[in-house]
Curated annotation (Swiss-Prot):
Domain of life: Bacteria
CDD domains in UniProt: crotonase-like
Main location: membrane
Pfam families the UniProt entry points to: ECH_1
Cellular compartments annotated: Cell membrane
Name by which UniProt lists this protein: Putative enoyl-CoA hydratase/isomerase YhaR
Amino acid sequence: MEFVQYACNGAVAEIILNRPDAHHALNEQMLSELKEAVEMAAASEALIVLLRGSGKGFSAGGDIRMMTSEHDPDQFKRLMDTIEAVTLNLYQMKKVTIAAIHGAAAGLGLSLALCADIVLAEKNAVLAMNFIGIGLVPDGGGHYLLKKRIGEAKAKKLIWSGKKLSASEAADMGLLDGTFAGDPAEGARPIIETLLASPLLAMIETKGIFQSLQIEELKKVLSLERSAQERMRRTKDHQEGIRAFLEKREPKFQA
């Protein structure tokens, strides 16, 4: 794999986003590789899975360059199929999953991080569910995952504003389970060591019970997000959002 690294060492597996020259922006190839890595982790004997980015950040979200050309229904279907598979596999994985964020976690990158059981961020990290800036709605289960962590009212406000959150702000509102200083692999180490000394099989059973009650809601949200994304990608606001992003100016939305 070119853009995603996978390693498994006994009870701990790591999935590392590795497209640093593009801030780990998720293009079609990278998403496909991420799907493969998540499937490998799910099938492994590991009981803990760590998701992190290499270099200077976690993920800037979906690659904006995939959105600059005319809407391609076939590519859109492939992308959404892959995003949904990654989301469901990460969320349902019979492991204890940890996302360790450093740098930026934005858009789809943040949605994927929120699939984890335990979400950590480096103290200087920045988090944003910023689809609104290009006239889109969250995907990757972002609506469900935000609602689950911070409630519908706060989730809606965050999605509508696209506000950038510091790690401390995100922790205060319940979006994070903790913060750390320095490298994400080292930052996650204390909690991994605690987990390795815990009855992980029982913890994973509890995870499965909770998720069996919620999985149909996540699947429904993914379906609704797919439909909404397809509609919004055809709007003038989305086209203006993309142009403004590329031209490094404020968008002029007209609805």
